[in-house]
């Protein structure tokens, strides 16, 4: 990567009159803002359909797009909806936070109207789209139709064992016929999502901006991916997990974090030439220009927690695929760039794998001043081949970090970066990242706005209230883009 910078902004966080960010006008406006601010990258969170808990890291599919992001206004412009139909539902009353309950209640009803009007009209284009995505789309559409049929339960709870275990093609054909209308509906939603996404991506590229996507290392148990290809996961004969993913206890979490995702059967994947991963990265490469691999350390070794344990305490480290997988990915996708999310638990094995991969790792400025464990995140310790962040979606915005951090940590930041009230605490830390030798610097949009309490995206290990933060209309001003542009140019990062 050449010296550059970008902004982290989830699609869900874009302003919208429809309760959640979409691929519509606000997304195009944000691309314009990035250009005006001299930025080179738009970093996003995963784009997949969210399930219970609303986390983009727990999706029903590793390939599908989130139907919530389909923009109603664009559907209206295409003759699939009316403006009155788009405005009628209650999309939530708080413009700062997504009300996922309201979205779930009303979005699919609205989108079903678009489906009824567009399915036959767009038949030829939908057929071409389905053919291009034949490797994953039929399983996903059938999976979602079956979930709806069985009260949105995970496939592990479906009462028909033949369907749950995918005993034969006949049982799948039975449900394809029984649930034909819903299979078509979920197919059409993906057609709409990817049509809008492709148009937005092309516009973003026209502005000289590249897109950094986020790829969760694990997929959800409640997903079409595990249901369709259970042979690639550590499951028993009844398709119950033998062990699940998590991370061990650390300074921040006494019990560790029990994620609950099924673990990969790396031997089975290796025997298949890592075809599952090649297909997954190929899908992501059609969305993004750069792919951030979440929890990179899981490629070196991963924390396996016996299934049924109440916490992640009693897990153990098991060797991952290492360079066997990474060499395959680098060889298959020479045009793609990868970022390794290598935060936490620094070990010689992870450091060696990062070096051998050739991928840049991550540095988080908020961690740099933590008196418990700075882990080499201070800018003077950087080498150029890394990505510097003010914080990630899992961190407090800088203004909130200032309130929450230990006084000695804040004092360290003030002394190290010569922070002043005149410049602004958050601007001084942004300056520290911008001026560092890191090839790429990325800040959360909340940090540029100086937002504090109530503006955090996610608190790991907690339930409820996460993934809801939204930008308000008009918050991204011309004055702000001018100030960002000036700092970006000053430190040699301007696009």
Give the label of every model feature segment.
Residues 1-82:
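Trp/Phe/Arg-rich N-terminal binding region typifying the photolyase-homology
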Residues 10, 54-194, 219-442, 446-453, ...:
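Alpha-amylase-like alpha-glycosidases and glucanotransferases acting on alpha-linked glucans and related
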Residues 35, 197-205, 330, 354-355:
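Surface-exposed amphipathic alpha-helices with a cationic face
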Residues 42-46, 204, 210-216, 284-298:
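Short acidic catalytic loops
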Residues 49, 216, 447:
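Short, glycine/serine-rich, charged loops/turns that create anion-binding
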Residues 186-219:
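Conserved, well-ordered alpha-helix/loop/beta-strand core segments that scaffold catalytic motifs
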């Amino acid at each position: 990567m050449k010296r550059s910078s970008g902004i982290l902004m989830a699609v869900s966080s874009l302003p919208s009159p429809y309760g959640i960010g979409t691929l519509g006008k606000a997304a195009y406006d944000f691309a314009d803002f990035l250009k005006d601010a001299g930025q080179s990258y738009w970093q996003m969170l995963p784009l997949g359909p969210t399930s219970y808990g609303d986390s983009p890291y727990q999706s029903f599919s590793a390939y599908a797009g989130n139907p919530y992001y389909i923009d109603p206004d664009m559907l209206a412009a295409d003759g699939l909806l009316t403006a009155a139909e788009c405005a009628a539902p209650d999309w939530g009353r708080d413009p700062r936070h997504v009300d996922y309950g309201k979205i779930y209640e009303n979005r699919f009803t609205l989108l079903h109207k678009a489906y009824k009007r567009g399915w036959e009209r767009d038949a030829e284009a939908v057929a071409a789209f389905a053919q291009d995505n034949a490797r994953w789309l039929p399983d996903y559409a059938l999976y979602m139709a079956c979930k709806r049929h069985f009260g949105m339960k995970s496939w592990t709870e479906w009462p028909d064992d033949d369907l749950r275990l995918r005993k034969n093609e006949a049982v799948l054909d039975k449900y394809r016929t029984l649930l034909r209308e819903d299979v078509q509906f979920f197919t059409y939603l993906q057609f709409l999502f990817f049509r809008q996404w492709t148009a937005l991506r092309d516009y973003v590229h026209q502005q000289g901006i590249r897109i950094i996507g986020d790829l969760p290392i694990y997929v959800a148990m409640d997903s079409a991916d595990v249901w369709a290809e259970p042979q690639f996961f550590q499951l028993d004969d009844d398709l119950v997990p033998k062990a699940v993913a998590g991370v061990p206890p650390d300074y921040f979490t006494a019990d560790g974090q029990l994620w609950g995702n099924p673990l990969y059967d790396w031997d089975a994947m290796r025997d298949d030439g890592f075809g599952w991963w090649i297909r997954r990265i190929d899908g992501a490469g059609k969305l993004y220009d750069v792919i951030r691999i979440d929890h990179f350390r899981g490629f070196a070794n991963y924390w396996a927690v016996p299934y049924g344990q109440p916490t992640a305490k009693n897990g153990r480290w098991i060797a991952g695929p290492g360079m066997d997988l990474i060499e395959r990915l680098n060889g298959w996708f020479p045009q793609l760039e990868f970022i390794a999310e290598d935060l936490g638990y620094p070990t010689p094995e992870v450091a060696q794998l990062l070096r051998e991969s050739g991928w840049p790792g991550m540095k988080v400025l908020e961690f740099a001043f933590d008196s418990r464990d700075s882990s080499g995140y201070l800018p003077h310790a950087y080498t150029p081949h890394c990505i510097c962040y003010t914080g990630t979606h899992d961190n407090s915005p800088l203004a909130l970090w200032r309130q929450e951090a230990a006084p000695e940590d804040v004092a360290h930041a003030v002394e190290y970066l010569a922070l002043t009230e005149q410049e602004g605490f958050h601007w001084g830390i942004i300056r520290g990242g911008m001026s560092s030798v890191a090839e790429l610097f990325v800040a959360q949009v909340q940090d540029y706005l100086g937002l504090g309490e109530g503006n955090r995206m996610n608190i790991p290990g907690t339930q409820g209230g996460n993934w809801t933060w939204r930008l308000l209309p008009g918050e991204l001003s011309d004055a702000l883009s001018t100030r960002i542009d000036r700092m970006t140019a000053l430190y040699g990062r301007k696009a």
